[in-house]
């Protein structure tokens, strides 16, 4: 795995996007002396390709400016979270090549968040509200109509503090009370109409057990966690732009830098004291055609068994993309290529595929395989003919060395490389025609062997003995070159041909009463059984190859072994997708 270091990042050409420009100005003006970012996923599912953009930005910015990035599990909704998701998140971030300076959890700060809430109550900035969720929505108003104050808005700080402590003690059932910020029920920003800061939820937490029957809401916990950790720049996607005034409200009214006593529970646990006044900056989220990235929809695909799990190679989770054969370098190149802006746009899926092709073309060794094999018998060679040919592992990179490839009288070739009635422009095998066998010489087809039903079962041909590599006849011009695998030495392999999961560009388009389920591509996975040269079988899982003339393939992360090779097609050699 390639790892991104501060030195590596600083050696790259200077990036000019608006976020980095803001950071440069903050450093130049002395607003900050160092940069501290964070990546704060909720451990309630697997990361997807959209998260890769945030990861590369959060960690990349920190590395470029010699700073740090914290990985924080935003674990404030325990009913939907799982330690397995938290472990997968750490694995995915590491796989992408990034390393966090600290692993934190919002639950690490529950005591501090509780004390901060008590401070807001004492300052008259928060109150306990008895409205249920439906009533809260009714009182909140609309975009064109101001909200109404809760009947409980004017409770005294003492009464609110007593009720909040009873909430903390577990006295009240779920949903009966919330702690709300006291801001402005007439605000044009609905997020500022007395948003909830805490709700009652008697649910066991993966880290704190049953200690807490109340949990902080996202906006409150997120803002203060940033401040607690000393985050300087809190990078979020555009949907949080309207939440920024609430983010700032929480930070400014709790004011941790001037109320350091609130941090005592952390200091007692050995956490550093590093509160800050972070700045939230929003950027556009990643949208790609032919995909859905809603966690709810991805979960439905798995739960309804429309795919084969979260790491199905057709999924857009990082686990799925990794199993498909996407590399960390290709993912980082993709994020770099699409750039950072505030403008929402839809990226064509081919951009992602081209980044993978570009990376694998450089690093992937070449091998020969047939996915629709047909026998070719070179009848002018002895039946026991066998030799070892020397092939380069990579035609553009001598440092990858060479390999031996067995060659014999009987070969497997690709069925699609022969045509009895060839179309115009055909350059491969035809009856009586010639073709170059990669690295072995020029062959002519003399006979087409068919079974009783008239199906072709083999070709018989002749190998020009003067056209072998190094001989004068090897320079004779023929129209086409095909790959092959020596039949006696071939290793049978399961080859999974993956394609895009959806057949239309906008599977989220619910027109005509259809949903994304109606646009699943029936050809997104085909399993064939072919043959590979021995050098392709003897390799570890997650090893990428270019199967010559076929595409880029990777040994399956879970199912491959040398005795039962399993290859996943990562991407074709060129973009052949038919657009609408």
Curated annotation (Swiss-Prot):
Q: Which GO terms describe its biological process?
A: glutaminyl-tRNA aminoacylation; glutamyl-tRNA aminoacylation
Query: Keyword Zinc, does the record have it?
Result: no
Where in the cell does this protein reside?
Answer: Cytoplasm
- Transmembrane residue ranges: none
Residue window of motif 'KMSKS' region: 292-296
Give me the residues that bind L-glutamine, please: 74, 218
The chemistry this enzyme catalyses reads: tRNA(Gln) + L-glutamine + ATP = L-glutaminyl-tRNA(Gln) + AMP + diphosphate
Is Protease one of the keywords UniProt gives this record? no
Q: Where is this motif: 'HIGH' region?
A: 41-51
What the entry lists under SUPFAM superfamilies is as follows: Nucleotidylyl transferase, Ribosomal protein L25-like
Provide the E.C. number(s) assigned to this enzyme: 6.1.1.18
One Pfam family from the record: tRNA-synt_1c
Q: Binding of ATP: at which residues? A: 42-44, 48-54, 237, 285-286, 293-295
Citing just one GO molecular function, the answer is:
ATP binding
State the GO CC annotations. Answer: cytosol
Q: What's in the keyword line of the UniProt record?
A: Aminoacyl-tRNA synthetase, ATP-binding, Cytoplasm, Ligase, Nucleotide-binding, Protein biosynthesis
Could you tell me the superkingdom of the organism this chain comes from?
Answer: Bacteria
Q: Which family does it belong to?
A: Belongs to the class-I aminoacyl-tRNA synthetase family.
Stored PANTHER family: GLUTAMATE--TRNA LIGASE, GLUTAMINE-TRNA LIGASE
The UniProt subunit note reads as follows: Monomer.
Q: What is the protein named?
A: Glutamine--tRNA ligase
Q: Which organism is it from?
A: Xylella fastidiosa (strain M12)
Gene designation per UniProt: glnS
């Amino acid at each position: 795995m390639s790892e991104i270091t501060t030195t590596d990042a600083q050696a790259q050409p200077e990036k000019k996007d608006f976020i980095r420009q803001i950071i440069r100005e903050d450093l130049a003006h002395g607003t900050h002396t160092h940069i501290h970012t964070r990546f704060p996923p909720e451990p309630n599912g697997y990361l997807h390709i959209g998260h890769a953009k945030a990861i590369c930005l959060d960690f990349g910015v920190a590395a470029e400016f010699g700073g740090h990035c914290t990985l924080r599990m935003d674990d404030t909704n325990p009913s939907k979270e799982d330690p397995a998701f938290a472990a997968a998140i750490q694995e995915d971030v590491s796989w992408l090549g990034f390393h966090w300076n600290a692993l934190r959890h919002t639950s690490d700060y529950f005591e501090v968040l509780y004390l901060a809430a008590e401070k807001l109550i004492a300052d008259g900035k928060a109150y306990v509200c008895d409205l249920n969720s439906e009533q809260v929505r009714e009182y909140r108003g609309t975009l064109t109509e101001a909200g109404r104050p809760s009947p409980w808005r004017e409770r005294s700080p003492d009464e609110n503090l007593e009720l909040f402590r009873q909430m903390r003690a577990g006295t009240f059932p779920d949903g009966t009370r919330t702690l709300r910020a006291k801001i402005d029920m007439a605000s044009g920003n609905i997020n500022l109409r007395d948003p909830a800061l805490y709700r009652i939820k008697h649910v066991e937490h993966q880290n704190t057990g049953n200690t807490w029957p109340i949990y902080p809401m996202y906006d409150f916990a997120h803002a203060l966690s940033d401040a607690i950790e000393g985050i300087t720049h809190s990078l979020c996607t555009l949907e949080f732009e309207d939440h920024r005034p609430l983010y700032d409200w929480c930070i400014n009214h709790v004011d941790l830098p001037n109320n350091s006593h609130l941090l005592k529970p952390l200091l007692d646990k050995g956490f550093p004291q590093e509160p800050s006044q972070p700045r939230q900056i929003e950027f556009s989220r990643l949208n790609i055609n032919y995909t859905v990235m809603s966690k709810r929809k991805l979960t439905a695909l798995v739960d309804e068994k429309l795919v084969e799990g979260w790491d199905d190679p057709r999924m857009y989770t990082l686990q799925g993309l990794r199993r498909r054969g996407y590399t960390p370098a290709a993912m980082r190149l993709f994020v770099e290529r699409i750039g950072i802006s505030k403008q929402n746009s839809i990226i064509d899926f081919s951009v992602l595929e081209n980044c993978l092709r570009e990376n694998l073309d450089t690093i992937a060794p070449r091998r020969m395989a047939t996915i629709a094999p047909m026998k070719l018998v070179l009848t002018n060679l002895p039946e026991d003919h066998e030799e070892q040919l020397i092939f380069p592992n990579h035609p553009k990179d001598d440092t990858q060395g060479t390999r031996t490839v067995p060659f014999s009288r009987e070969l497997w070739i690709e069925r699609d490389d022969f045509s009895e009635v060839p179309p115009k422009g055909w350059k491969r095998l035809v009856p009586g025609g010639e073709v170059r066998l990669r690295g072995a010489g020029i062959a002519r087809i003399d006979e087409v062997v068919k079974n009783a039903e008239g199906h072709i079962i083999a070709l018989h041909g002749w190998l020009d003995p003067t056209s072998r590599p190094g001989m004068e006849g090897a320079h004779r011009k023929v129209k086409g070159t095909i790959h092959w695998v020596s039949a006696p030495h071939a290793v049978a392999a399961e080859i999974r041909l993956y394609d895009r999961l959806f057949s239309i560009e906008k599977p989220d388009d619910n027109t005509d009463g259809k949903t994304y389920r109606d646009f699943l591509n029936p050809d997104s996975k085909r399993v064939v059984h072919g043959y590979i040269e021995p050098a392709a079988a003897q390799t570890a899982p997650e090893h990428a190859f270019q199967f010559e003339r076929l595409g880029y393939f990777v040994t399956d992360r879970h199912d491959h072994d040398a005795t039962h090779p399993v290859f996943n097609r990562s991407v074709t050699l060129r973009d052949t997708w038919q657009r609408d």
